[in-house]
Amino acid sequence: DNPIVKGCIKAAPGHKIVAMDLTTAEVYVAAVLADDKNLMKVFQDGGNFHSNIAKLVFNLPCEAEDVAEHYPTDRQAAKAVTFGIMYGAGANKISQQVSTDSGTFFSKTQAQEVIDDYFKQFHKLKKWIDLSSKFIMDNGFIYGATGRKRRLPNVKSDNQGIQSHEVRSGMNFLVQSVA
């Protein structure tokens, strides 16, 4: 979005330059892999993704385009949960992220409530995450959508931090091998 950079780039006659925001591409891939129609619909409806999520999760009494102005902390919480759950963040991490990004204290309890509300809306995503994580824990590997196998041998470690890292790596692999 830098105007100086944009001014340096010109399309050839008869052509157009298209800019794309792919920051939510991995979330869409997860929605498709989980077959979560509710989450896919948020993408299909267009508009600002995180505002749409916040309106849906918090049942906000405004139009999605007004969420950022009237409910900035809720929007930030929805954004933090959307990206956080993709990478294994729990209530503590999401609490810290929302507090930092919004400049407003957001407790661990509030974060857990948002996570719970998020998964009420997107229950198929939750089921997919749970089943995939269990498969990784049980087998020490996971197959991506294209059939590629990712070995995660340290998932059987006695160290909980190492186990969690392996599960996160496996979940990241599932999404990033397609995105």
Where are these regions (language model features)?
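Conserved catalytic core of nucleotide polymerization and phosphodiester-bond processing enzymes
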Residues: 1-179
